[in-house]
Amino acid sequence: MSITREKKSELISEYCLKKGDTGSSFVQCAILSERIRNLTEHLKTHKKDFHCRRGLMVLVYRRRNGLQYIKKKYGDDQYLALIKRLGIRDIFH
């Protein structure tokens, strides 16, 4: 269910803004998106896992707030590029 250290370092290197960037909002949204994908796959087989479902909703809320921050701070162009790279829908348009 959780992402491995190797996968996390791949995401950090792919979405970082500069070398050594591990905590920017772009990286955080990418890591949250991967965790959301993992939990979604888990819930496909374990439909009654309501504790996991609540955790998924918390992660979705955190990612939405991060995306909202990116859109406000960096503009529509970088926001749209990020959601295209992540493969998620635009929820603000």
From Swiss-Prot:
One of its GO terms (biological process) is translation. Pfam families: Ribosomal_S15. It comes from the Bacteria. The keyword Cell inner membrane does not apply. InterPro entries: Ribosomal_uS15, Ribosomal_uS15_bac-type, uS15_NS1_RNA-bd_sf. One of its GO terms (molecular function) is rRNA binding. Gene3D superfamilies: S15/NS1, RNA-binding (1.10.287.10). Keywords: Ribonucleoprotein, Ribosomal protein, RNA-binding, rRNA-binding. The keyword rRNA-binding applies. GO terms for cellular component: cytosolic small ribosomal subunit. HAMAP family: Ribosomal_uS15_B (MF_01343_B). Belongs to the universal ribosomal protein uS15 family. One of the primary rRNA binding proteins, it binds directly to 16S rRNA where it helps nucleate assembly of the platform of the 30S subunit by binding and bridging several RNA helices of the 16S rRNA. Forms an intersubunit bridge (bridge B4) with the 23S rRNA of the 50S subunit in the ribosome. Part of the 30S ribosomal subunit. Forms a bridge to the 50S subunit in the 70S ribosome, contacting the 23S rRNA. This is Small ribosomal subunit protein uS15. The gene is rpsO.
